[in-house]
Amino acid sequence: MKVVYSDTHRDHDPQQFMVRGKLKRSNEQPERAFRLLAAVEQDGHEVVAAPDYGPGPRAAIHTPEYLRFLETAHARWQLLDDPSDEVMPNIHPFPGQPCSYPESLVGQAGFHMGDNACSIGAHTWAAATASAHLATHAAQLVLDGERAVYALCRPPGHHAYVDRANGFCYLNNVAIAAQHLRRVHPRVAILDIDVHHGNGTQGIFYRRADVLTISLHGDPRHFTPFFTGHAHERGDGEGLGYNLNKPLALGTDLDGYLPALRDACASIRAYAPGALVVALGLDAHERDPYKGMQITTPGFATLMAEIARLGLPTVLVQEGGYLSDDLGPNLASALRGFASSA
């Protein structure tokens, strides 16, 4: 399988991440991508670079105000009186209340950053745009005839909304890939198997019928992102019925996961898309630091084989999966499983 990768991410190394009121080192570190890259190289996958697709693919998903903010925020932040090294918000709009766009950079940070897990450093914009190019190129390779392509994206993207960074994510790579596939295919499906709900992806396509979004994730009553990912969220307007959430109990193992995945695959078959984008989170693993589920390393092969049996042109986009000795083996298992049924 072709693997699209760039080392531009290496200088994006967020230092701050708030956990239960304490600032800690972010779990979204460059070492994640290095371990994933080592795994695909060890298994003999062909690693290719992505060209610069320009601003078009990201602009097709994200607002101009948000993109300007992401590109300029860090340099502008450093001009403030006594700034931190990274941009972090300390105030947010209140949902359901009137909200005007602020001129103040501090206000813009609160407007465009949904939490304290998406700090912006000097190299964040370059890493995020490079990551989006990887997803776009993977989609283009699939349009050019590849059965499946893996985009080794870092930073991840599925928590990013049209105008808001969130949960380690800045540009929504799976949404960008899906929109690129829409240039050819009237219908595209997104299947998110990250342990966390793909809230940004849901928000982007919530009122659209041309992209089916399905997410399997830890029950948001007890697990981040908490406020979205419930089964009753089914889309709105033209998109009603085209957003499916399958929240799973924390600690779910392969036996509990497979029925939900098979239901998701049945929904994809019924939708009959021309192509599929998989938000490939590996953080449902039993020893992932987030400890949300109990999928084993061989279990990822089983899950991905089930997805491959859909028989669709498929873009695999890296999402979560955090530092442990199992991270690389989990990816290797997932890709082998997909190849076994492709």
Stretches found by the model and what they are:
Residues M1-L191, H196-A342:
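HDAC/HDAC-like amidohydrolase catalytic core signature
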